[in-house]
């Protein structure tokens, strides 16, 4: 499973929130964290028979194990089909652009970004030194690949970036183009995204979790994402 080796505060926060939800059996959604805090203060029921806890689990110093009720095991941020799997993916995948506690867009995997005067061209600079859990570097190619998958004709997940109006996205989705013309890799750490019109939510839509092209793109062919649906995590 791929995780980005980056100690961002936002990811640590997501982990804490996800753990709280997981400890509650997935009953509480992230939007109900305040309610989760109340329940946690009331106490957590300990294991009925602590002797059944494996010795290896007792000795862990760097791993937290939390149970969830009904996971489907699809730990992919763009293909999960229930909230339990979403809770897990929110912990192990970091966003390109995130939100702070006031709902303001803030850097995530992206170090910074600029927007053209006409609000149609977004130049995103990645943080240097980021790697996936296998040690491979996070690059602009990975971001471009992720956005391309979301514009694939066969993509039917919950993430809809068509409203970002990326240039060439509609043609790629319709099978009229071999690539998305609005996605341009400037250098390993810089991606330029050109849109056909300004949009207030464009940055949020293109700033989601990033998939490793080397891992998730091994069998990619436009119009066939079946392999990605079965490649969990």
Where are these regions (language model features)?
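Gly/Pro-rich hinge or "lid" segments in bacterial periplasmic/extracellular proteins
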Residues: 197-233
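N-terminal low-complexity, Pro/Thr/Ser-rich intrinsically disordered segments
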Residues: 39-63
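Sec/Tat signal peptide C-region and signal peptidase I cleavage site
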Residues: 30-36
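N-terminal secretory signal peptides that target proteins for export/translocation
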Residues: 1-14
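N-terminal lobe/hinge region of extracytoplasmic solute-binding protein
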Residues: 46-52, 65-117, 230-233
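Extracytoplasmic
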Residues: 59-63, 91, 108-110, 117-121, ...
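Aromatic- and charge-enriched surface segment that lines or borders ligand/interaction sites
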Residues: 111-159, 192
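Bacterial N-terminal signal peptides
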Residues: 18-30
């Amino acid at each position: 499973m791929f995780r980005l080796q980056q100690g961002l505060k936002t990811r640590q926060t997501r982990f804490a929130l996800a753990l709280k939800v997981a400890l509650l059996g997935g009953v509480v959604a992230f939007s109900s964290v305040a309610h989760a805090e109340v329940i946690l203060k009331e106490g957590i029921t300990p294991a009925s028979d602590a002797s059944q806890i494996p010795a290896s689990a007792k000795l862990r110093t760097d791993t937290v194990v939390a149970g969830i009720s009904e996971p489907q095991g699809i730990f992919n941020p763009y293909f999960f089909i229930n909230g339990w799997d979403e809770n897990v993916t929110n912990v192990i995948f970091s966003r390109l652009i995130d939100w702070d506690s006031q709902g303001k867009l803030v850097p995530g995997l992206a170090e910074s970004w600029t927007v053209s005067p006409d609000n149609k061209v977004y130049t995103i600079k990645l943080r240097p030194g980021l790697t996936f859990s296998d040690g491979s570097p996070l690059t602009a190619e990975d971001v471009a690949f992720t956005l391309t998958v979301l514009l694939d004709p066969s993509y039917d997940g919950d993430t809809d970036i068509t409203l970002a109006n990326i240039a060439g996205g509609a043609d790629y989705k319709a099978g009229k183009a071999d690539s998305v013309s609005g996605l341009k890799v400037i250098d390993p750490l810089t991606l330029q995204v050109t849109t056909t019109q300004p949009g207030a939510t464009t940055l949020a839509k293109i700033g989601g979790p990033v998939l490793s092209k080397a891992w998730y793109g091994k069998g990619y062919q436009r119009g066939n994402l079946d392999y990605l649906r079965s490649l969990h995590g």
